[in-house]
Amino acid sequence: RELLMTWMGKAQQIRRQNLKVNAVASKLFSMLREDGLRCCILKGQGNALMYPNPYSRTPGDIDVWIDASREMIMEYARKRFELGDDIRLQHLETSLDGVPVELHFFPCSMNNPIYHARLQKWFRRNADLQCSHIVGLPDGAGDIAIPTSSFNVVYQLTHLYHHFFDEGIGMRQIIDYFLVVNDFSKNVFLDHDLSNHPVNFSNHPVPLSKEGSTFSPSPSSSGSGDVTAPS
């Protein structure tokens, strides 16, 4: 009974944290859009929407990818946020209403410079669709843009790759990616009548290591978008 009460208390704590982060994520997204910056909330709040209970995922900081140049993002951040010294290759760190925020110049990096360049090219090619993919947060907390299913299945795998080599992988990342793959399979494959709209894998190879390789099933009605492998 004591353990059950501890778990119930922890669940309520996580719920309150999610309510706070959702409100701030919506505020941040609206602020950036009103200031003329196209953006997309990565991982956290979008991933939570795939959970059976969207308040059950332990939230972290808010990662927002801003579709603008590094110089423009830096100039904007200096005007609108308090910045510390932690400015990295792919993001800078700040906070909004007490919630840690990472403003991303690009979503993720790779250690190999050739693969990194290909990945950034792919990010730029798909940026517009991600910043246009608007969803509603639970209980009317507001709207945010999140990545499509087909973008997530590639992006979050590279994020796991980065964690594996540089930071370590936690259970949250593993569960997140399981739900990402599950969401991708439902939105991109199971919603299609493959007998009428076959996906020809021989014409659309998936490997990321070959220049020009693509895999592009037609978008589903849920807005999952296309899948084009980095090349």
Name the predicted role of every residue range:
Residues T214, T228-A229:
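Ala/Thr-enriched low-complexity intrinsically disordered regions
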Residues E211-G212, S222-G225:
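Glycine-biased, low-complexity coil/linker segments
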Residues V206, P217-S220:
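Ser/Thr/Pro/Gly-rich low-complexity, intrinsically disordered segments
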Residues R1-G60, W65-L194, P198, P205, ...:
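Conserved NTP-donor binding/palm subdomain of two-metal-ion nucleotidyltransferases/polymerases, i.e.
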Residues N53, S220-S221:
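N-terminal low-complexity, intrinsically disordered patches enriched in charged
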